[in-house]
Amino acid sequence: MGTIAIIAAVILGISFMTFVAFFGRLPALRNTPISFLHRLIWIHLPNGILTVDRTLTNGRLTTSLTRLGRHLWYDQHPTILIFFFLLLSVGEYLYLPVAWPHFSFTHKFFGTIAILCPYIFLYLSAYTDPGVINAKTHVREMARYPYDFTLFHPGTSCETCHLLKPARSKHCSICKKCVGRMDHHCIFINNCVGANNQRWFILLLLSTAILTLYGGVLGLVIIRAKIQARFPYWTLMPWWTSTQAWNSGDLDFHRWLLLWSWGLQSGVAMGGVTLLALLTTPLVWGLLGYHLWLVYCGTTTNESMKWQDWQAEMDEGGVYKRRMAADGSREKDLKVEPAWTRWPVEAEQIMVRTEDGKPPRSSHRLPGEGEWEAVWRLKDVENLYDIGFWDNLVDVFLPYFMFKESKGRSPVDEREFGRERGRNRRRSS
């Protein structure tokens, strides 16, 4: 009982803290215990330690810790990537010598594939350019998506990169670069997840989820066979035990746990890795499911937060939309917009928020036509970047797929964009 309790407690603790760290900031979990724990661990607890240190050491300890923490959290470094690599390799080193002789040829074949795939996709996720935007790639990234006039508006410049920001892009404060179709910065791959490597990231999640589930189940089967070879009446789940064995006292719940512990102690290394795999499997599958859901919705982690911010604005009132030109004849400002993009649709609406809660005045010269309509729910807003699950998948796995033919000319006027870049640099200097 002691062995199984310690191993399970440690693994559950690590898994739960990882879940809180990764999911605590999600808009869907706002005002929940998970969000509260995230704020407690990452905001209130550090502030409390800072207050105590200021009282006892005049802040010397927290100054050093803050410098270290700033480097760990806000600078690009491979610490967590190395940890993830070691977690995979050390776990397999402890697991395989005991488990491998028990595998059939089929399990050895598919097991080898399951072991290798996470390493391949980890390398591709970490070392593939996520879609960094610079002077050489700016034209290409501008032609990737049109502005939707809801989350992304033309004419916004990055104050760090001195470039007009393409639609769906974001500047990463860790990588210090703008990234096309930015999803998030992932510390496990020491890289941003963007337009060019999101496919490898999803395949990394899928292969890791399969590996943990496959390895955990096979380890469970081996442990069960070992216990049942000596105690035939033992079953994997206590409620599967025969009524006769349960009623006779040969296998009550306490004895069932003792036999579990005995099975783990006969191969502690493999048993510990099996428990780690089984207990982390829901976390990995949940993360995979979340990212597939984002693909289904035609959005990203970054954009989902923007949508939730819009919902908060709608709850307060003062959000309005109106349609763009129905025939797509809107005249574009080619100084800040691409003439064409590879995307199959153009913006159908513009959405804005007003400070006074009243519709925008005509003097504001905002694009669109017709009357302004108050918006209270996200489902009343069209997501330009959701073109159906299949096409969304194509966009992720074939990031340069042309959904429509090019116009035979550059999507942007290089001279106009060059002037705009020059103005941006002068403003920031």
From Swiss-Prot:
Its EC number is 2.3.1.225. The chain crosses the membrane at residues 4-24, 80-100, 113-133, 202-222, 275-295. It is found in: Endoplasmic reticulum membrane. It catalyses: L-cysteinyl-[protein] + hexadecanoyl-CoA = S-hexadecanoyl-L-cysteinyl-[protein] + CoA. It is a multi-pass membrane protein. GO terms for biological process: protein targeting to membrane. Residues 1-3, 101-112, 223-274 are lumenal. Residues 408-421 have a biased composition (Basic and acidic residues). Pfam families: DHHC. GO terms for molecular function: protein-cysteine S-palmitoyltransferase activity. InterPro entries: Palmitoyltrfase_DHHC, PFA4/ZDH16/20/ERF2-like. The keyword Transmembrane applies. Residues 25-79, 134-201, 296-429 are cytoplasmic. It comes from the Eukaryota. Residues 156-206 form the DHHC domain. One of its GO terms (cellular component) is Golgi apparatus. Residues 408-429 are annotated as: Disordered. Belongs to the DHHC palmitoyltransferase family. SWF1 subfamily. Palmitoyltransferase that targets several endosomal SNAREs. Palmitoylates the SNAREs at cysteine residues close to the cytoplasmic end of their transmembrane domain. May have a role in the cellular quality control of transmembrane domain-containing proteins. The DHHC domain is required for palmitoyltransferase activity. This is Palmitoyltransferase SWF1. It comes from Neurospora crassa (strain ATCC 24698 / 74-OR23-1A / CBS 708.71 / DSM 1257 / FGSC 987).
